[in-house]
Amino acid sequence: MAYLHTTQSLIITLDVDASLLSQLQQLEDAGFSVVELNNAEPAILSDVMKKHPGLRLGVSNILKTDQLEAVQKAGAHFGSSPGFMPSLIQTANIYNFHYLPGVATPSEAMQAAALGCQHVRPLPATLSFCTLLNKYLPNLRLFPADVTQKEAEKLLKLDSVSAVSVLNPELQLCEIAM
């Protein structure tokens, strides 16, 4: 599986609701380039991609292989799930799709690595769990999700943490993070 690279240490995750397009415009205007949509349907994803071609868009909460295939075909740049399922990793590998499996234990992280994942989403994204993965599995790139600004600052000091994801942040947080 290809390595997911971002020069942005903060990934913004947004719920798909009536304010989505205006929020995306605000984020793009503020200089953000990587945004993750929470539970986006392929049609919504395609529409957003047409309106915001400069954004690298991902989709979170992928639970089944058909969802992964649909968002990949719709043009998502990456996807993630809240848990570990080998079938999702195997499907992502077929499409060479950037996929972040959720891992809750070192054993799940090791299994993900054995299946070809170079990056995982620690859930829960606690500092202690990410520190453990950083120490014992330093080759895995970590993308913790649903973190606060205070947690983000601490997590980003770990060598293995590539980026953190903040869910529905206030615009002020976005300005501080840049």
What label would you give each PLM region?
Residues 12-16, 33-41, 55-63, 76-84, ...:
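Catalytic beta/alpha-barrel core
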Residues 43-44, 66, 87-88, 107-109, ...:
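Short secondary-structure capping/turn micro-motifs that flank functional sites
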